[in-house]
């Protein structure tokens, strides 16, 4: 079905790739072809919307219309076509978007992926009429109202009862409350087949996916509500920030655990210990323990082929580069942490030294949170939060049981993974495998 649908979309492709896709390799122009051949009026090989050589200079200057953008709004959300292009109320129904600003416009209002990750995901997403890239909405709200109680979270076991929107947030998005977004509540469930690692034979990705993108990918996998995503990534509600009430942090982690089915790690420290550097360090480490459990649940307990994960080395880098050395982490926490890491590490092939970025919270724009650029700002400049640790596989500081010549190819596959490998179908292993009920 995947190949048939792709062939149908690509049949009438006649134009050069659009500006925002020009950095992708020419052997896989799937997204370009969708945008040009079907959703931008170029169905029958006619001149593309971007044609600068048209006889109508006015048309050339005008570029894409918002009405054209709505034609492929399924990339954001097919049910709410006015959401995802910034504040919908600020745009006239058919206001033009100059083509030279189109790329920046989308970059600011789509999921906060880095260019590398966005290209990776855009290249490997199967888009059909009922599948969606979760939309980014700029909505009004306040920090105090952004909690989601566990009882309101949909259950993975019964996804048909899901009524919580899959809203994506960029760094530029303000806090929100569910009262602000009644239009975004969806009925039923949206199936997702985001292929995170399918690629051409022999092709490898250099570098790694930035820290925050791992959480975005994780939330894509589970279709998590935005407030739960904030709990996972430690973003909207800053986990470990001494200025945030501890019960908010506890509720967010509880919501995350309830939604993903991952057990809680235990109670927070006493209230008299929930301030200052020690608590920040404890909370940050505790948060990574919880994330390790969630990633373990998503990637290690489901039939995702190791070769898929090899293309996302940052997951390995993140989990193996953080060592719980805080004096507030007792032996039970460390044991639980290492069990998850040891289970996950064999799924990966390579390791990169990595330091985790942390949020930089600013009062600008009434509660908006700013975040360090992964490539520029790292934890090494803020050692009072998490001890910097750049060890990896084979590093005795991490775990003395790992051989220095460790090779992931020697790890035996599970029966489900063997089945996928025998089929030789890259597209067979996708995020929808995480929850067969979807």
From Swiss-Prot:
GO terms for cellular component: virion component. It is found in: Virion. Induction: Expressed in the late phase of the viral replicative cycle. Keywords: Late protein, Virion. It comes from the Viruses. Residues 145-167 are annotated as: Disordered. Belongs to the asfivirus p49 structural protein family. Together with the penton and the other minor capsid proteins (M1249L, p17), forms a complicated network immediately below the outer capsid shell, stabilizing the whole capsid. Plays an essential role in the formation of infectious virus particles. Especially required for the formation of the capsid vertices. During virion assembly, associates with the membrane and probably mediates the docking of the penton complex to the inner membrane, where it recruits the capsomers to form the penton core. This is Minor capsid protein p49. It comes from African swine fever virus (strain Badajoz 1971 Vero-adapted) (Ba71V).
């Amino acid at each position: 079905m995947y190949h048939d649908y792709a062939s149908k979309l690509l049949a009438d492709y006649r134009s050069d790739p659009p500006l925002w896709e020009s950095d992708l390799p020419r052997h896989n122009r799937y997204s370009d072809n969708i945008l040009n051949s079907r959703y931008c009026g170029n169905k029958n090989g006619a001149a593309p919307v971007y044609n600068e050589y048209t006889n109508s200079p006015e048309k050339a200057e005008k570029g894409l219309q918002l009405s054209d953008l709505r034609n492929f709004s399924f990339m954001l959300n097919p049910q709410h076509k006015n959401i995802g292009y910034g504040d919908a109320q600020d745009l006239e129904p058919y206001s033009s978007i100059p083509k030279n600003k189109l790329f920046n416009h989308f970059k600011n209002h789509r999921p906060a992926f880095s260019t590398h990750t966005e290209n990776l995901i855009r290249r490997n997403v199967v888009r059909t009429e009922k599948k969606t890239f979760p939309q980014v909405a700029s909505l009004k709200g306040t920090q105090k109202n952004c909690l989601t109680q566990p009882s309101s979270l949909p259950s993975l076991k019964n996804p048909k009862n899901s009524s919580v929107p899959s809203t994506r947030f960029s760094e530029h998005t303000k806090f929100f409350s569910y009262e602000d977004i009644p239009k975004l509540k969806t009925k039923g469930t949206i199936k997702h087949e985001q292929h995170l690692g399918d690629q051409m034979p022999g092709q490898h990705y250099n570098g790694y996916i930035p820290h925050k993108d791992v959480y975005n990918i994780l939330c894509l996998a589970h279709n998590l509500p935005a407030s739960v995503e904030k709990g996972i990534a430690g973003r909207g509600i800053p986990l470990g920030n001494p200025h945030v009430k501890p019960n908010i942090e506890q509720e967010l982690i509880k919501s995350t655990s309830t939604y993903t089915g991952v057990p809680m790690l235990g109670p927070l420290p006493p209230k008299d210990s929930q301030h200052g550097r020690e608590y920040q360090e404890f909370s940050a480490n505790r948060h990574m323990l919880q994330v390790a459990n969630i990633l373990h649940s998503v990637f290690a307990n489901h039939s995702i082929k190791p070769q898929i994960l090899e293309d996302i080395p940052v997951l390995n880098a993140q989990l193996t580069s953080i060592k719980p050395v805080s004096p507030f982490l007792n032996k039970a926490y460390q044991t639980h942490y290492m069990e998850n890491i040891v289970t996950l590490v064999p799924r990966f092939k390579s390791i990169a030294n990595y330091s985790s970025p942390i949020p930089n919270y600013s009062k600008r724009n009434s509660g908006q949170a700013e975040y360090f650029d992964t490539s520029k700002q790292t934890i090494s400049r803020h050692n009072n939060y998490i001890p910097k640790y750049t060890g990896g596989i084979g590093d005795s500081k991490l775990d003395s049981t790992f051989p220095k010549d460790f090779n992931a190819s020697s790890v035996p596959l599970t029966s489900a993974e063997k089945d996928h490998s025998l089929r030789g179908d890259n597209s067979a292993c996708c995020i929808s495998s995480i929850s067969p009920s979807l």
